[in-house]
């Protein structure tokens, strides 16, 4: 069987490649405890392992030790699987973003702004021809809140909720950080649509996608595990 790995900043997601159109079952493991992955690979040794990683080389080595064989780590290229990379240095694009775009282009082709809301917030523009125009990277919600707490003497990291007009610091921090994420998403959708001269779709992925969807002024579609979907497509072909 073929094993797919999405090694993110905070955890590892993994799945066995499903046959045909079936959706793969996704598992998640913290980087400090890969026992479940190791046990699964002992029971069913993978014949091939494909992965996309944005984590450290030390963690990548630990992952390879757990699976018991070398991992084919995805390296972004100038083009692959119908997607064209706009980066000046294509291999400097994050492997997770590259896999997500391949997954999005094949799962739901069309003009779209692809948002991944996790540790970082990435906003990428992908047209219906598979051309990646470029994108932005910013701190995610958790990083924004923690950086504010660490950079100030008295604000701390209180639990708050989003309010239109916050009347306390906890809600003010949460609302301000969330607004700092939704505004650039809305702006990029408008900008890309104007550039193309036609409507574009908003695709949301990542752990904070449901929260963002609740507070965006535009509609978006949440699509889970696009990195693994992109890897699954690549596993069925060669670039």
UniProtKB/Swiss-Prot annotation:
CDD domains recorded: ASKHA_NBD_PanK-III (cd24015)
Biological process, per Gene Ontology: coenzyme A biosynthetic process
Pfam families (UniProt xref): Pan_kinase
Highest taxon listed in the record's lineage: Bacteria
Cofactor remark from the record: A monovalent cation. Ammonium or potassium.
Binding site for ATP: 6-13, 119
Residues involved in substrate binding: 87, 94-97, 169
Entry keywords, A to Z: ATP-binding, Coenzyme A biosynthesis, Cytoplasm, Kinase, Nucleotide-binding, Potassium, Transferase
Secretion signal, residue range per the UniProt entry: none
Keyword Transmembrane: no
Catalytic activity: (R)-pantothenate + ATP = (R)-4'-phosphopantothenate + ADP + H(+)
Pathway(s) where this gene product acts: Cofactor biosynthesis; coenzyme A biosynthesis; CoA from (R)-pantothenate: step 1/5
Catalytic site: 96 (proton acceptor)
InterPro entries attached to this UniProt entry: ATPase_NBD (IPR043129), Type_III_PanK (IPR004619)
GO cellular component: cytoplasm
Entry EC no(s): 2.7.1.33
Cellular compartments annotated: Cytoplasm
Family membership: Belongs to the type III pantothenate kinase family.
Subunit structure, interactors included: Homodimer.
UniProt function note: Catalyzes the phosphorylation of pantothenate (Pan), the first step in CoA biosynthesis.
PANTHER family: TYPE III PANTOTHENATE KINASE
Protein name stated in the entry: Type III pantothenate kinase
Organism: Laribacter hongkongensis (strain HLHK9)
């Amino acid at each position: 069987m073929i094993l797919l790995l999405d090694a993110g900043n905070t955890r590892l997601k993994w799945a066995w490649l499903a046959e045909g159109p079936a959706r793969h079952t996704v598992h998640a493991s913290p980087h400090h405890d890969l026992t479940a992955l190791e046990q699964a690979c002992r029971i069913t040794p993978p014949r091939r392992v494909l992965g996309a990683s944005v984590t450290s080389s030390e963690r990548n080595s630990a992952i390879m030790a757990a699976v018991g064989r070398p991992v084919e780590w995805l390296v972004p290229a100038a083009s692959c699987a119908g997607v064209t990379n706009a980066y000046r240095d294509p291999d400097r694009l994050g492997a997770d973003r590259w896999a997500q775009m391949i997954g999005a282009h094949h799962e739901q082709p069309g003009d779209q702004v692809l948002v991944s809301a996790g540790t970082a917030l990435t906003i990428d523009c992908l047209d219906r021809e598979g051309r990646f125009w470029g994108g932005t990277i910013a701190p995610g919600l958790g990083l924004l809140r923690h950086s504010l707490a660490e950079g100030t003497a008295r604000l701390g990291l209180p639990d708050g909720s989003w309010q239109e007009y916050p009347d306390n610091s906890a809600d003010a921090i949460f609302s301000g950080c969330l607004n700092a994420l939704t505004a650039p998403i809305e702006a990029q959708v408008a900008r890309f649509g104007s550039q193309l001269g036609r409507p574009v779709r908003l695709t949301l992925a990542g752990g904070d996608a449901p929260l963002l969807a609740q507070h965006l002024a535009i509609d978006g579609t949440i699509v889970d595990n696009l990195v693994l979907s992109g890897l699954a497509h690549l596993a069925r072909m060669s670039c």
